[in-house]
Amino acid sequence: MKQNIKRNWIWILIVMIVIGIILYFSIRNLFSTKVAEWSISELLNNIERAKENTTDALYFKEITVNPFTNSITGVFNNTDNTSTSFVTYTNLDLLRLSGVASDQGVISKIFTPEVFLTANNVSGSLKSVATPQPNPFLGILISSVPVLILIFVMVWIYRSQVKMMNGQGGAFGGDKGTAQIIKSDKKFTDIAGNKEPIEEISEVVDYLKNPGKYQQSGARMPHGILLGGPPGTGKTLLAKATAGEANVPFYFVSASSFVELFVGMGAKRVRQVISEARKNSPAIIFIDELDAIGRTRGSGIGGGHDEREQTLNQLLVEMDGMKENSGLLFIAATNRTDVLDPALIRPGRFDRIITVGLPDVKEREEILKLHAKGKRFESNVDFANIAKRTPGFSGAQLENVINEAVLLSIREDTKVINLYQIDEAIDRVMSGPAKKSRTITKEELTMVAYHEAGHAVVGIKVPGGNKVQKITIIPRGNAGGYNLMMPENEKYNYSKADLYATIASFMGGRAAEEIIYGDNKISTGAADDIKKATSIARRMVTQFGMSDLGPIEYQSDEGSPFLGKALASNSSLSNQVNHEIELEIRKIIFTAKEQATKIIKQNIELLELIKESLLKKETIVGEEIEYIAKHMKLPPEKIEEKDLSKNSEDNNLDSLIEKTSKKE
């Protein structure tokens, strides 16, 4: 492809140079001085008239006698202070005159009829030779050159477009195909977590290596495997590991590369990729971001006649049509399995749909240890505790945490990575870097401290609420403060009480502001808390059936995948039902907020202590919060960082404080 592009640019450069030369000479001839064609008699007569009116004998500005073409050219000084360019052709021998033509002092003696006749031994009068006429065919040819060049360029561009549409490259890029044969050094052993997806794919890879073992039992290989799940969970990494494990050609293609400018290109490229893979079967075709072409048909603005749907139709035919795909395995990855066309995910096309979900606490520990290989950490770094502090993190985020910690270690010039750097790396991944240089007034800082302390108090006192593991009043991202709230244990199912407790934890910040400053002085700092609390309450009413409206789903998930939920929502709910839903959401939020307000009023002293600790240290962790709640006093300042960061499951902070006090 690069050679084609280079060759195209060379031709473009040549054409531009030729056109430039033609334009240069055309403009030069257009603006050049008009040349008078004089016969010898006219030339001599002009010289005689100049003799009568001129005394300095400077008749010419310039003059050239060319004996090879028998021509005289020059610029003649007229008597009216003007000049005339002339040319004279003759059959006389001008060789003797060429040597003295530049000496204007003798021109008056040379350019006389007698001299011309004597010098050439010609008797009689002087005769002029007709001016040479150019070849008419040559003139037509020269005038046709620009038109021919223009036609050539147009034909060349047209052929380039045709080549590109045929997949052979062209003036606008294009390539022979969109698939790349990948050779990966990744193995399944290089992946931490995702045990179930690895087992499913390993079975298919084994089928490709040992087809006889399965054929004896009458089993057929799955036509396709669809990997779905949130971003960053390792779907593409699984595909790379599959390429490294399988000893068969592995074709990688992005779904978006099928659809381009020209109509029909997508379907053609699908045929090209699959045809090439069939020639080298058994083979694997991996399609990344399948939702780019696999969305439900007939829902878009263009109906069923757009390029994307033609491409999808071709893919459906190639995967399970009249042609057999023996030895050909399709693997695809997407974050949006919910918007895929039903015909694409039926058995016979993508037989297996594997969800690659977010890792649990044990898998997070394995992922952290995998990415920590080759890096130096302090001895007190416990990856199990780090895994507990990062619920909901994907594999990509965990890798980024380790990388950020390494970068912080280099920035601070420490030879090993310590707990503080890992802690800061987690915060950077979640909320961005701290903005320590931002100027904040003391009043605003105090309000932020009360807000964050309110979250902590409610989390401590409400059973099932989110526990605050870390609080800081140092701005991060767009937030004035930051708190890390996590449930005590990771759950997959939540009770109604758990959700109420979670909403109450979110409303703790706003409740603290109202208690301390009053309704008229509340701030915008609770915006994100309100958004999250409202989202949970809405799902409790419309999806989970946890309200007085009963166990009914009031929210349909059949919106258009193209126009979005808002534009394409065809709600079948009446205005009265929507009003009742809003009332139930309001009831849940207000109930949780009243609970948070009541708890904070009952524990106002704890709120003040946590606020004072925040203003004093700017950042406090879960162990310090627990100590304050248990002893109702601020923890000592000189607590060793390695002790403070240990796991608090056994609530051993009291003994650490006692040890620290004894050291003092």
From Swiss-Prot:
Gene3D superfamilies: 1.10.8.60, P-loop containing nucleotide triphosphate hydrolases, Peptidase M41. The keyword Hydrolase applies. It is a multi-pass membrane protein. InterPro entries: AAA+_ATPase, AAA_lid_3, ATPase_AAA_core, FtsH, P-loop_NTPase, Peptidase_M41, Peptidase_M41-like. GO terms for molecular function: ATP binding; ATP hydrolysis activity; ATP-dependent peptidase activity; metalloendopeptidase activity; zinc ion binding. Its main location: membrane. The keyword Metal-binding applies. Zn(2+) binds at H451, H455, D529. It is found in: Cell membrane. The active site is at E452. GO terms for cellular component: plasma membrane. Residues 1-9, 158-664 are cytoplasmic. ATP binds at G229, P230, P231, G232, T233, G234, K235, T236. Its EC number is 3.4.24.-. Residues 639-649 have a biased composition (Basic and acidic residues). The chain crosses the membrane at residues 10-30, 137-157. Residues 31-136 are extracellular. It is an enzyme of class 3 (hydrolase). GO terms for biological process: protein catabolic process; proteolysis. Homohexamer. In the central section; belongs to the AAA ATPase family. This is ATP-dependent zinc metalloprotease FtsH. It comes from Mycoplasmopsis synoviae (strain 53) (Mycoplasma synoviae).
